[in-house]
């Protein structure tokens, strides 16, 4: 049953109906639509449209429908209703007859769908926050267990300075904490109710919209009806948070894909998150991580697509806004799935400490320590930098790490170098010296783990 048929003398072309109908995706708003309808029925009592008895009958029928939807959501897609609002209203009329036709008094699908979508977003943000914090906790736990796993840190994908696997884990904890903060900030702006704004100019019934917002769990009601029914910047904000969050997960995946290669060999992934080859029996492919990396693109696409949809729309509601849902649903589903999968990857990961240590020792990652040593002996840093560069060239020529060059060799580059240089060139010394806040020293890493544990609870 269409909600708008009185104006028309011809039925819609079936091809147009298929093009126009949105039930195939907005069915996901069924629970929110029913919850919003219960609240609206209460508001109609306050303005005399419904009696208390009528409202109770409607609420009971809506609650039965809600339980039915939760038990068998696929039933919605068996309908030829235009959208979820039409479906809910049709089912309600089936249950209570003519009384069901009174529920839409003073309400438009414009404020109705805006409310449904915000309620869905609030529910989904709660799920995302939980999954985000679970991944943070998994990273902190992995860091706790790998504080002594020394490995090379990289710039330009070249070995740069020694770090620990724990410090690497904590870098992603910081990124995820910012993602969490972005979601919490978005939730504050999302937490306002558009219900009662009608099609665009507000409702003609003197409904207490603040009370109505409270019944729905919103912090307050929106302040402008035109903005309320045409606002989708909360969708953009969540898509932006998802796009940034997926970039972080993509980088996390790329790092571990590299660490897992035969060339690096720093970690081994669990059989539970890898797959094999149909041809090559020896293969163990990091499919979970590659899919996380690959799915990043579709989330960026959803954000860009929504930006382009909204950029030229006049106030207030336009049918273009029907395009707000599929990209949003897919992007947030994808982000949620990837958060869960990243945590699963960490659950069975094995860090190969000897190989990590070997790689850290091979990459001349202690070259900066030698430069700092020379500075402490009074050599200007720029000169020290040049001296150490020459020493590294010689070490490479001989196929040795810096710390294995004899003192006589090192003194050819600078006479100020003494026996006291060798303890400074050890990997442990390199770590210990990075003791300022945020550094890789064991003390700072332990503090960072303790701080993260306390924050996550």
Curated annotation (Swiss-Prot):
PROSITE patterns listed in its UniProt record: FUMARATE_LYASES (PS00163)
Gene3D superfamilies given in the database record: Fumarase/aspartase (C-terminal domain) (1.10.40.30), Fumarase/aspartase (Central domain) (1.20.200.10), Fumarase/aspartase (N-terminal domain) (1.10.275.10)
Major subcellular site: cytoplasm
KW Cell membrane (keyword) present: no
Entries under CDD domains matching the protein: Argininosuccinate_lyase
Enzyme Commission code: 4.3.2.1
Pfam short name (any one): Lyase_1
Keyword Lyase: yes
Catalytic activity: 2-(N(omega)-L-arginino)succinate = fumarate + L-arginine
SUPFAM superfamilies: L-aspartase-like
Biological pathway: Amino-acid biosynthesis; L-arginine biosynthesis; L-arginine from L-ornithine and carbamoyl phosphate: step 3/3
GO cellular component, one term: cytosol
Entry keyword set: Amino-acid biosynthesis, Arginine biosynthesis, Cytoplasm, Lyase
Enzyme class: lyase
GO molecular function, one term: argininosuccinate lyase activity
Subcellular location: Cytoplasm
GO terms of biological process kind: arginine biosynthetic process via ornithine; L-arginine biosynthetic process
Top-rank lineage group of the source organism: Bacteria
UniProt record similarity statement: Belongs to the lyase 1 family. Argininosuccinate lyase subfamily.
NCBIfam families for the chain: argH (TIGR00838), PRK12308.1 (NF008964)
UniProt protein name: Argininosuccinate lyase
Organism: Escherichia coli O157:H7
């Amino acid at each position: 049953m269409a909600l708008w048929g009185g104006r028309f003398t011809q039925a819609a072309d079936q091809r147009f109906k298929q093009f126009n109908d949105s039930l195939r995706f907005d069915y996901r708003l069924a629970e929110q639509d029913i919850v919003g309808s219960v609240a609206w029925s209460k508001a109609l009592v306050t303005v005399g449209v419904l009696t208390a008895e009528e409202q109770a009958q409607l609420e009971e029928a809506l609650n039965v429908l809600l339980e039915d939807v939760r038990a068998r959501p696929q039933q919605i897609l068996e309908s030829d209703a235009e959208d979820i609002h039409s479906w809910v209203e049709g089912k309600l009329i089936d249950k209570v007859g003519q009384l069901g036709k009174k529920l839409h008094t003073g309400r438009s699908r414009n404020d109705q769908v805006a409310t449904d979508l915000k309620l869905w977003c609030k529910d989904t943000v709660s799920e995302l926050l939980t999954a985000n914090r679970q991944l943070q906790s998994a990273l902190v736990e992995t860091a706790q267990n790998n504080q002594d796993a020394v490995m090379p840190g990289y710039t330009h994908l070249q070995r740069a300075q020694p770090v620990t696997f724990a410090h690497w884990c904590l870098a992603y904890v910081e990124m995820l904490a910012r993602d969490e903060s972005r979601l919490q900030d978005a939730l504050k702006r999302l937490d306002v109710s558009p219900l009662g704004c009608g099609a665009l100019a507000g409702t003609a019934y003197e409904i207490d919209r603040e009370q109505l917002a409270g019944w729905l769990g919103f912090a307050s009601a929106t302040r402008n009806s035109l903005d309320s029914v045409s606002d989708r910047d909360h969708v953009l904000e969540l898509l932006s948070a998802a796009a940034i969050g997926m970039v972080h997960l993509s980088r996390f995946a790329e790092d571990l894909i590299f660490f897992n290669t035969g060339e690096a060999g720093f970690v081994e992934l669990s059989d539970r998150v890898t797959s094999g080859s149909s041809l090559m029996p020896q293969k163990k492919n990091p499919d979970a991580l590659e899919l996380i990396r690959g799915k990043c693109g579709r989330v960026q696409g959803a954000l860009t697509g929504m930006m382009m949809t909204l950029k030229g729309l006049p106030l207030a509601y336009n049918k273009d806004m029907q395009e707000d849902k599929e990209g949003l649903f897919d992007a947030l589903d994808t982000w949620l799935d990837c958060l869960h999968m990243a945590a699963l990857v960490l659950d069975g990961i094995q860090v190969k400490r000897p190989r990590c240590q070997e790689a850290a020792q091979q990459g001349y990652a202690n070259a900066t320590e030698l430069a700092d040593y020379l500075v402490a002996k009074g050599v200007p840093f720029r000169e020290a930098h040049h001296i150490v560069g020459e020493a590294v060239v010689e070490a490479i020529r001989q196929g040795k790490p810096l710390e294995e060059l004899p003192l006589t060799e090192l003194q050819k580059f600078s006479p100020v170098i003494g026996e006291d240089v060798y303890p400074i060139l050890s990997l442990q010394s390199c770590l210990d010296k990075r003791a300022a806040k945020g550094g890789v020293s064991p003390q700072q890493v332990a503090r960072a783990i303790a701080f993260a544990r306390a924050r996550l609870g």
